[in-house]
Swiss-Prot record:
InterPro entries: Phage_lambda_portal. Forms the portal vertex of the capsid. This portal plays critical roles in head assembly, genome packaging, neck/tail attachment, and genome ejection. The portal protein multimerizes as a single ring-shaped homododecamer arranged around a central channel. Binds to the terminase subunits to form the packaging machine. It is found in: Virion. Its main location: virion. This is Portal protein B. Proteolytically cleaved by the viral protease during capsid maturation. Disulfide bonds: none annotated.
Length: 530
């Protein structure tokens, strides 16, 4: 019987079969035959090694400069030196009049600024942090521990106007009592209901070494009124995830290897720099060990002493020197080897750059930012790299920093309204009926890094003139609040007029000249080839 011809690939497999998904196969040449990872949920993969993984990340951040720089980049680009509020209650949904809502917004922002950035850290129950420092710490902890815990507390002993305080809680203190295994409804210190929603958290009271307390406290997720009793911020990647995964998991092995590699390379360079030259002998292994482990006999019969005396006598007689350049003669069988450090790199720089690029990709930052090396990058490449990193930082600001900030602000606003410290305008819903509408806010952090300040300003002004942007968005990119800038400009303009100073016209003329030059055709500004 004649068979129907079938097209096959290089392995003899029918072509139609080879065109299907091959991720579950052995791979070309069998490379994936032993790659058999189990299909696990996020909690099943993360929680058994959570404490060890976080401890390793802590160690890297404390003792590795690259890891410490990665955390600092998250703090500086996501938060910056001041985390400013732009309060935006949903006044239409709440049924407020726009003019009344604007006055209410101004009063809330002024009161929040005084409370949040107090000079003695009044917002912190420990008295150590301002609000911005809370957010910076939270972003840093989220980078190397994967989550943030902040506990709102009520201070009944304070003499300050507001009694709401916050307590930073280390993720290392949140665990199943006694560091036990837990169960379906108690996972790594988090109690969950049948839907996976957190119900309560178990916190070790004191994790200080040898403190001897070992007591665990159960803190509910929220109080009966709906006020949060524990703020838990992390970005889940899968259904049913209970705890956050730190960002160093994917690059932890490379970071540790790079650390060891750099230390070994440094030791090698130090050894080569310590010795200008060495004299190598052609003693065989047996004789060398015999001399080194000379038998405990009389001085004259000790082989180690005898050979050293011969070497000493020879070199004393023949005056072998290196500083004087001339080396007349060596002991028979010896060899002079000069130690040079010129070849100490041996491809190390290229390997280091490759590892740093891998680590930077895993941490969401650019290679130039992580290594602080801008020597091999052009303007276009630097701006493209900075824009990619900026997009990542903006996502982290929105879903991590701003989320924590808004929840902290909501706890404070609840007290301010409930105790009548701030009188809100008439609304159809009270705070407890529409908590999100009352607490809605945008947050202004660090501005975008300007590669070329002039071009950045030109782009911003052109967008505003073309109706593609606003002063609010443009100044937010610079890390500024447009309302503060406008108020300051009004004050400065009035002071200049009062002092008899005219407006500096040269600023506008210089700017218009720069705009005109930037709009010239490229061939007019570039010298032609002859």
């Amino acid at each position: 019987m004649k068979r129907t011809p079938v097209l096959i690939d290089v392995n003899g497999v029918p072509l139609r079969e080879s065109l299907s998904y091959n991720g579950g196969g052995a791979g070309f040449g069998g490379q994936m035959a032993e790659w058999l990872p189990p299909a696990q949920s996020a909690d099943a993969a993360l929680l058994p090694a959570l404490r060890l993984g976080n401890a390793r990340a802590d160690d890297l951040v404390r003792n590795n400069g690259i890891a410490a720089n990665a955390v600092a980049l998250h703090k500086d680009h996501i938060v910056g030196h001041m985390f400013l509020i732009s309060y935006r209650p949903n006044w239409r949904w709440l049924g407020m009049r726009e003019t009344a809502a604007k006055s209410f917004v101004d009063e809330v922002e002024a009161a929040w600024s005084e409370y949040a950035e107090g000079m003695f850290g009044e917002i912190d129950v420990e008295g150590k942090r301002t609000f911005t420092e809370f957010i910076r710490e939270g972003v840093g902890v989220h980078a190397f521990n994967g989550e943030i815990f902040v506990q709102p507390v009520w201070d009944t002993e304070t003499t300050q106007l507001f009694r709401t305080r916050f307590k930073a809680v280390s993720p290392k203190r949140v665990d199943t009592p006694g560091h036990g295994m837990g169960n379906r409804f108690l996972r790594a210190g988090v109690e969950v209901d049948r839907y996976g929603r957190a119900v309560a958290y178990h916190i070790c009271e004191d994790d200080f070494p040898f403190s001897g307390s070992g007591r665990w406290e159960r803190i509910p997720r929220e109080l009966p009124t709906g006020r949060p009793a524990m703020l838990h911020i992390f970005e889940p990647v899968e259904d049913g995830q209970t705890r956050g995964a730190n960002q160093f998991y994917s690059v932890m092995e490379r970071l540790k290897m790079l650390d060891s590699l750099q230390a070994t390379q440094l030791q090698s360079a130090i050894v080569k720099a310590m010795y200008a030259a060495t004299i190598e002998s052609e003693l065989d292994t047996e004789k060398a060990f015999e001399y080194i482990a000379g038998a405990p006999q009389e001085q004259k019969d000790n082989p180690l002493i005898n050979i050293l005396e011969k070497f000493s006598s020879w070199y004393d007689t023949n005056n072998v020197t290196l500083g004087g350049v001339k080396i007349p003669h060596l002991f028979p069988g010896d060899d002079l080897k000069l130690q040079t450090a010129q070849d100490s790199d041996n491809g190390f720089s290229a390997l280091e750059q490759a590892l740093l690029r891998y680590i930077a990709a895993g941490l969401g930052v650019s290679y130039e930012q992580l290594s602080r090396d801008y020597s091999k990058v052009s303007y276009s490449s630097a701006r493209a790299s900075a824009n990619e990193s900026w997009r990542y930082f903006m996502g982290r600001r929105k879903f991590i920093a701003a989320r924590l900030a808004t929840q902290m602000f909501s706890c404070w606003l609840e007290e301010a309204l409930l105790r009548g410290i701030i009188r809100p305008p008439r609304a159809r819903f009270d705070f407890y009926q529409a908590r999100s509408a009352w607490s809605r806010a945008e947050w202004i952090g660090a501005g975008r890094m300007a590669i070329d300040g002039l071009k950045e300003v030109q782009e911003s002004v052109m967008r505003i003139e073309a109706g593609l942007s606003t002063y609010e968005k443009g100044l937010a990119l610079m890390g500024e609040d447009y309302q503060d800038i406008f108020r300051q400009q009004v004050r400065e303009s009035a002071e200049r007029q009062k002092a008899g100073l005219s407006r500096p016209v040269w600023i506008e003329q210089a700017y218009q000249q720069q705009i005109a030059e930037s709009r010239r055709p490229e061939e007019e500004t570039t010298p032609r080839e002859t």
